[in-house]
Amino acid sequence: LDMMTGGPVPTQAVFEGSDLDLDTLQELCTMFDSMSGESKCYDDISGEELPTKLVNEARETEMGWVRDIGLYDKVQRAVAQTSGIKPLPVMWVDVNKGDKEAYNVRSRLVGKELKAKTKETLLAHQLFSAMPPWEAVKTLLSLLVTDGVDGAGTSPEEELEMAIFDISRAHFMPKCKRELYIELPPEDRNPGDGDLVGRLNRNMYGFRDAANGWSEDWQATLSGVGFKVGVANPALFHRGSDNTRGAVHGDDF
């Protein structure tokens, strides 16, 4: 127990002097929690303990979103087996966006897809998501402050504005292009369900092509309303009809 309390060093896959792997140790920790009558939750970034009640509420909020967008359909495990596709495990990532005085717990349901399992099936371009250069942001700021200056591409009567948009749960937006199955989270299992798994309808955090899928999704959306996406860098976009320019960094516009 002292060894488990100390924990492994970050580069080790097992505890020093122990034949137990991390999966086995995780099962033991879960067992100890159940024996004590408590289920403890921890911040996946800081490692600090989080109030279980707040974590459960955050997870239920996330599950509400998952159900609303139809992230997956419940199907019999035999469907996945017939397709020859193994359902992938999922996990919760819990983070306190606030502090100990004012908690703001967020939970995200993520898949656990490993590189070793997909290196033969996913090509490099399917894993790539472009990022804008810092110079692009400086250019946008320069255009903003030269509003109405001759040669800047604007007229005196134009009022340029800059806005920043953060897209929540961006990786859930695109439709899933691959046939994928996941193990159902405990929060979505009901008595009498039987041996069900989830067949994904949309992309999901934790899958290796999720970022690329999101990029293709927003690019198609903007192209549909008159924007041109950059050729040298597809993280940039422009619409000449109203002189709108922008850059995308991940899920931030």
Stretches with model-predicted labels:
Residues 235-239, 243-244:
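Gly/Ser-centered flexible loop/linker motifs
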Residues 1-220, 224-231, 236:
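Chromodomain-type histone methyl-lysine reader module
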Residues 243-253:
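Histidine-centered acyl-transfer/condensation active-site motif
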